[in-house]
Amino acid sequence: MSSTPIKHYLQFSDFTPDEYEYLLDRARILKAKFKNYETWHPLHDRTLAMIFEKNSTRTRLSFEAGIHQLGGHAVFLNTRDSQLGRGEPIEDAAQVISRMVDIIMIRTFGQDIIDRFAAHSRVPVINGLTNEYHPCQVLADVFTYIEQRGSIRGKTVAWIGDANNMAYTWIQAAERLGFTFHFSAPPGYQLDPVMVPASASGLVKVFDDPLAACQGASLVTTDVWTSMGFEAENDARKRAFKDWMVTTAMMDRAEPDALFMHCLPAHRGEEVEAAVIDGPKSVVWDEAENRLHVQKALMEYLLCGRY
């Protein structure tokens, strides 16, 4: 084993602004190669283990296709057909799995699970989603904004909806990349101060009125009202969030060239109007595709360093 410390990607705050500048540019290059059908196999014969405790379409497809396009292979594991669902300690699973593969992506529940796994892994670990953070998605969102509008530094991102893993990851991104984050949610669904780092507090503004939160925003974004694992609260959440649907009126409060994003899957008529997500300011399909390209850049960087 190399004595060089293993680099993981467990939160957005794990990387520096300089690393993000490199990664985002590298994603642009890899996307261009993909569009031009250029073969690029820096991860030839490398193996990615994908561990899913929470189901997903976009996460599995983007990582599995991504490692293949870089010349590697993917192995899919879930709790139904592995010892992970039969009580094997996380630390033991990490020790074993990381001796057989080159890189690991985990989509799970608590952040503590992935932190414990990474602490005992011999290879890089990537957060595919936890209850607390979703760094790969926000990385794709930032890349999509830059691709469409240029630098995000100094801009305003408006989040309309629950204080969930996406919201907390956007806060970390604001601190790392230098933009303002507007947040609006109904009472009872506000940000947890413990999850807002002191270094980002000056960049975060909380609004009771979602229309006011969208004022001057360059990007308006949202997510489902009921995240995975909170299904029992669905009816209560629908009642609480009924005035926090992203509407054309909210988009009209934003900058004239503002974009709309949603990490998907979306529920039209709940967290977003059909006229918004299917309208000219929506870039949700580019956003979804870009998971593929930023994650390729991420895996390449974690395994190969910089080119």
From Swiss-Prot:
It catalyses: carbamoyl phosphate + L-ornithine = L-citrulline + phosphate + H(+). PROSITE patterns: CARBAMOYLTRANSFERASE. PANTHER family: ORNITHINE CARBAMOYLTRANSFERASE, MITOCHONDRIAL, ORNITHINE TRANSCARBAMYLASE, MITOCHONDRIAL. Keywords: Arginine metabolism, Cytoplasm, Transferase. It holds the Pfam family OTCace_N. L-ornithine binds at residues 165, 223, 227-228. GO terms for cellular component: cytoplasm. Its main location: cytoplasm. Belongs to the aspartate/ornithine carbamoyltransferase superfamily. OTCase family. Pathway: Amino-acid degradation; L-arginine degradation via ADI pathway; carbamoyl phosphate from L-arginine: step 2/2. GO terms for molecular function: amino acid binding; ornithine carbamoyltransferase activity. It is found in: Cytoplasm. This is Ornithine carbamoyltransferase. NCBIfam families: orni_carb_tr, PRK00779.1. Its EC number is 2.1.3.3. It is an enzyme of class 2 (transferase).
